[in-house]
Amino acid sequence: MNDSEFHRLADQLWLTIEERLDDWDGDSDIDCEINGGVLTITFENGSKIIINRQEPLHQVWLATKQGGYHFDMKGDEWICDRSGETFWDLLEQAATQQAGETVSFR
């Protein structure tokens, strides 16, 4: 993967997250902000999830209350380099825990 393809895939990921949160109709308040390639999701209780790009490694990093995760593109999915779980699974688990209700991005 070259840098431009990495940025295209990361942009696509950011856009999907932003669209899903714009459509959010749950009880809790969830905000999303993108600044300088860093996407921050803020929950009603003040907790945050931070997602950023690591261009030199062509990775996406996810920081949650539960820990930090690094994802590589494998096939057509972002996969955690430690657990093998998908980005969407780990993001949904963390967002659900931090929101106090089920959050889905798919």
Swiss-Prot record:
**What SUPFAM superfamilies does this protein map onto?**
Frataxin/Nqo15-like
Signal peptide per UniProt: none
CDD domains the UniProt entry points to:
Frataxin
Q: Which UniProt keywords apply?
A: Iron, Metal-binding
Could you tell me which InterPro entries the record lists for this protein? Answer: CyaY, Frataxin/CyaY, Frataxin/CyaY_sf, Frataxin_CS
Q: Which GO terms describe its molecular function?
A: ferric iron binding; ferrous iron binding
Which GO CC annotations does the UniProt entry carry?
cytosol
Q: Which SMART domains match?
A: Frataxin_Cyay
Q: Name one GO biological process term.
A: iron-sulfur cluster assembly
- Domain of life per record: Bacteria
Report the protein's function. Answer: Involved in iron-sulfur (Fe-S) cluster assembly. May act as a regulator of Fe-S biogenesis.
Give the family from UniProt.
Belongs to the frataxin family.
UniProt xrefs under NCBIfam families: FeS_CyaY
Q: Can you name this protein? A: Iron-sulfur cluster assembly protein CyaY
